């Protein structure tokens, strides 16, 4: 069954996240698609100190509980520290390791000791075959996913290496996720924030 991970990226309010989760759930149900709602309580790697980071872990987890109780959706959120893992593990279904932290051994191993699925976003600086080293840190995990989110291509640009995507599908016995929207990102491309071109997303996801 096809799985879709979708949401507002950054959790801003209960009303907004609930509306997005409800709409995505309805569409995915219509087409028999497995759905995970995704939102972040803290965007800790913004390009600038002025970048909006979110409403924080306390308010977000309260809202996540409300959304799960009312809609029954599965929830994915990213974590940046071991302390955040202990806070989130009983609320969300998937703990996501951000791409910039995809080689952080302690963070990965702590996430893998929970009952959550662990989704590790492959760093923009890693080759497909480097993922073997990441997976070697995940022996105790309930389930692990690897997400392709683009590869650095010079300054402020990413490309998608579909050869690498196929390599991971062929060589790793874990689900491989494709993050089409972040693969079209232009990191720091707007100076104090990242840019991107959403027009490329439909072509990449075909």
Label for each model-derived stretch:
Residues 23-31, 52-76, 110-117, 165-176:
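Alpha-helix-loop-beta-strand connector modules within alpha/beta enzyme cores
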Residues 55-56, 70-84, 93-106, 116-128, ...:
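Catalytic beta/alpha-barrel core
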Residues 33-40, 74-79, 178:
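Short beta-strand segments at enzyme active-site cores
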Residues 115-206:
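Catalytic alpha/beta core domains of metabolic enzymes, predominantly
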Residues 1-5, 62:
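N-terminal amphipathic alpha-helix/helix-capping segment at the start of soluble metabolic enzymes
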Residues 7, 37, 88, 120, ...:
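Conserved, mostly hydrophobic/aromatic
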Residues 5-16, 35-57:
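Glycine-rich, proline-tolerant flexible connector loops at the mouths of alpha/beta enzymes
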Residues 17-21, 85-86, 90-100, 105-114, ...:
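A short alpha/beta connector and helix-capping loop motif
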């Amino acid at each position: 069954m096809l799985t879709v991970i979708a949401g507002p990226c950054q959790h801003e309010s209960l009303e907004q996240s609930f509306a997005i989760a409800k709409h995505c759930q309805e569409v995915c149900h219509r087409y028999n698609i497995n759905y995970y709602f995704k939102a972040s309580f803290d965007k800790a790697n913004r390009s600038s100190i002025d970048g909006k980071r979110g409403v924080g872990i306390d308010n977000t987890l309260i809202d996540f509980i409300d959304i799960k109780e009312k809609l029954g959706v599965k929830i994915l959120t990213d974590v940046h520290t071991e302390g955040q893992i202990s806070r989130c593990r009983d609320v969300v279904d998937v703990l996501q390791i951000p791409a910039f932290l995809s080689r952080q051994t302690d963070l990965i191993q702590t996430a893998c000791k929970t009952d959550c699925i662990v989704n590790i976003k492959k760093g923009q600086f890693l080759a497909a075959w480097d993922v073997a080293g990441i997976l070697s840190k995940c022996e105790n995990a309930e389930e692990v996913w690897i997400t392709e989110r683009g590869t650095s291509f010079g300054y402020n640009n990413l490309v998608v290496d579909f050869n690498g995507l196929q390599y991971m599908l062929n060589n790793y016995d874990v689900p491989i996720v494709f993050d089409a929207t972040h693969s079209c990102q232009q990191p720091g491309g707007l100076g104090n924030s990242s840019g991107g071109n959403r027009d490329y997303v439909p072509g990449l996801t075909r």
